[in-house]
Curated annotation (Swiss-Prot):
Organism: Dinoroseobacter shibae (strain DSM 16493 / NCIMB 14021 / DFL 12)
SUPFAM superfamilies: Nucleic acid-binding proteins
Gene: rpsL
Keyword RNA-binding on entry: yes
GO BP field: translation
Sequence similarity: Belongs to the universal ribosomal protein uS12 family.
Stretch list, region Disordered: 1-28
One of the record's GO molecular function terms: structural constituent of ribosome
Subunit structure: Part of the 30S ribosomal subunit. Contacts proteins S8 and S17. May interact with IF1 in the 30S initiation complex.
Coiled-coil parts of chain: none
Modified residues (3-methylthioaspartic acid): 89
Protein name: Small ribosomal subunit protein uS12
């Protein structure tokens, strides 16, 4: 515990709040190119093959991002738009790919929560 005299000499420093999605550099989304598209397994109590992609962003960073929804058309060299938001059961995956933007197609036959998956309104 510092004395009052010590606090006068050197006041307390405020804690620095770090962003949870630093590589976006305070932007809402960033564009990038897929360098690898693959599946991976989640942490302990869960079991699945989660679709993820390694993306090289326009600022030079390379991040792992999650591909939401059922089936996708992404492959190497696809241009994608990513947003922040981690996947709780995939360590190291802190970004999501936006569906229905740039080279990513929306989810087919999606009826509810369509805007999150880039699906057009069914006729």
């Amino acid at each position: 515990m510092p004395t009052i005299q010590q606090l006068i000499r050197k006041p307390r420093q405020p804690k620095v709040k770090r962003s949870k999605s630093q590589h976006l550099e305070s932007c809402p989304q960033k564009r990038g190119v897929c360098t690898r598209v693959y599946t991976t397994t989640p942490k302990k109590p869960n079991s699945a093959m989660r679709k993820v992609a390694k993306v090289r962003l326009t600022n030079g960073f390379e991040v792992i991002s999650y591909i939401p929804g059922e089936s996708h058309n992404l492959q190497e060299h696809s241009v994608v738009l990513i947003r922040g938001g981690r996947v709780k059961d995939l360590p190291g995956v802190r970004y999501h790919i936006l569906r229905g933007v740039l080279d990513t197609q929306g989810v087919k036959d999606r009826k509810q929560r369509r805007s999150k998956y880039g699906a057009k309104r069914p006729k």
